[in-house]
Amino acid sequence: MNIMFAYDDSRNARFALKRTLDMFGKLQPMIILIAVVEQSLDTSSSSESNYLEAKEKFTTAVRETAESLGEQGFDIEVIIGEGDARKVILKAVQNLNPDLLVIARRSHEPDGNVIGQSIDALVEEFNFMTFGSVSSFLARRATCPVLIQACPAVL
């Protein structure tokens, strides 16, 4: 079994990953962690350096999660894409044909990490567009079953 997990290192993603492994871990599935860095729209040099720093921290966090899963005995593949998360994940689903795609539902609670804080500020402005937009888009278009994990408000 191959499970593709859309991972953004948020509190909800970590919780959903744990729950997914609780549900499917005994099957020893291949876990494909797909993480997407959204490209910065601001082209100033300070913004670029902040973006690159945040991207590096995000990439490191994703790889550390993959390493931890590997230590638990799971076969892991990591894909780190850049761009529109919906399109990057959909293309990966179409190319890799996983048995299941897992997504953590977006939270209204701000996340503590750098990426989460940056994204949270933008999301509030475009909440009508972004609330569930990735989940909704992939649930309609993915060529495999999609599991959208609900997460508690407080862990």
Task: Specify the residue positions occupied by each region the protein language model found.
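Short, solvent-exposed amphipathic alpha-helices that sit
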Residues: 19, 53-65, 88
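Acidic, proline/glycine-rich short linear motifs
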Residues: 35-60, 154
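General small-molecule cofactor/ligand-binding pocket signal
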Residues: 32-34, 77-81, 147
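Gly/Ser-rich helix-loop-strand patches that form or flank binding pockets
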Residues: 99-155
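Solvent-exposed polar/charged
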Residues: 22-25, 91-95, 140
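Structural beta-alpha unit
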Residues: 70-112, 120, 155
